[in-house]
A protein has these predicted regions:
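Active-site flanking residues adjacent to catalytic metal/cofactor-binding acidic residues
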Residues: 35, 56, 168, 186-188, ...
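Conserved S-adenosyl-L-methionine
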Residues: 26-86
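SAM-dependent nucleic-acid methyltransferase catalytic core
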Residues: 2-19, 25, 29, 74-185, ...
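Short helix/strand-bridging catalytic loops that position acidic/His residues to coordinate divalent metals
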Residues: 198-209
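Short, glycine/acidic-enriched loop or turn micro-motifs at the edges of active sites
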Residues: 39, 60, 172, 190, ...
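Long, positively charged, glycine-interspersed low-complexity recognition regions
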Residues: 209-285
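A short acidic (Asp/Glu
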Residues: 46-48, 65, 176-177, 194-199, ...
């Protein structure tokens, strides 16, 4: 029987919902403790069975939303969302109401309000300026807190109870929570793409060769301590190859698995079929 996956209510760019079936077939069959090092909207975390979950992301605004979700009942959260939408007259068409609510959020920084704001924003992006004010434009005629997002939110809320959330740069993460045989999943920004979340212009540190090399060094060290890992990445994009990734997995004799997917709603999609994006999953087991 085909497993039914839960889609995160975040609609995070680069999320793994549509390829969960592909990457999970290479995950360990039994997981005691799992760390999702770049969890984003938590699609992988909420869809992977483990005794204990740790979910981390540098974007503390997103982590604050999840920890806020953990504090309250599903009924309370839905009532808050519905009441706020009504109070501020938020809709697919009222750009002025959106801007007023965005200004209000930027003055209060209430996590649940940020979630609502994201629901009505362009492409559902979490985009911030250097002052960490939310600055994503209005998603006119496209974005809203619709019935599908409501259903996804309800399903997600049921899966958050045993997840420990943190917001740290990956270099500063406490890997001491992992013991031999445990599992780490890493879905970092992709070095050779130009996605909006790794350009260093969203209020958070960008991604460069330095971060790429540091991450691989950490994964190699975890491997030496008997910890299993799976790394999502792109090895080729529009004719550009990630030579750092290729050398690292070959030198360490890790396993490279091809993933068949195109990100049609972001900068990954290439019209020239000769220059498609080649996404992979690297495992050490």
């Amino acid at each position: 029987m085909k497993k039914e996956y839960i889609k995160s209510p975040m609609n995070y760019i680069g999320n793994k919902y549509r390829i969960m079936g592909q990457i999970q077939k290479w995950f360990p069959r039994k997981i005691d403790t799992m760390v999702d090092l770049f969890c984003g909207g938590c699609d992988v975390t909420i869809n992977t069975d483990a005794q204990t979950h740790y979910a981390n992301d540098i974007n503390y605004h997103v982590i604050d939303i999840f920890t806020e979700f953990q504090k309250y009942s599903t009924d309370y959260i839905l009532e808050y969302i519905d009441g706020t939408i009504k109070k501020w007259h938020l809709s697919k068409t009222d750009a002025e109401a959106y801007k007023m609510f965005r200004d209000y959020y930027n003055s209060t920084k209430e996590p649940l309000d940020l979630y609502i704001l994201m629901c009505f924003s362009f492409n559902y992006q979490f985009r911030f300026n250097s002052n960490h004010d939310y600055n994503n434009p209005f998603g006119k005629d496209r974005s809203s807190f619709n019935d599908v997002m409501r259903a996804n939110l309800i399903k997600t809320l049921d899966r958050l109870s045993n997840i420990h959330f943190t917001s740290k740069e990956f270099q500063n993460y406490d890997f001491g929570v992992l013991k031999q045989g445990d599992f780490l999943y890493a879905d970092p920004p992709y070095l050779i793409t130009c996605a909006s979340y790794n350009d260093g212009k969203r209020g958070f540190t960008g991604w460069s060769e330095r971060e790429e090399i540091n991450l691989y060094s950490i994964l190699t060290d975890l491997d030496k301590h008997g910890i299993k890992f799976a790394l999502s990445n792109v090895i080729e994009h529009k004719g550009v190859k990630n030579d750092i990734l290729a050398k690292w997995y070959r030198d360490n004799k890790y396993h490279l698995h091809r993933v068949n997917f195109n990100y049609n709603n972001s900068n990954y999609h290439a019209k020239n079929t000769d220059k498609v994006t080649k996404e992979v999953l690297v495992t050490n087991y």
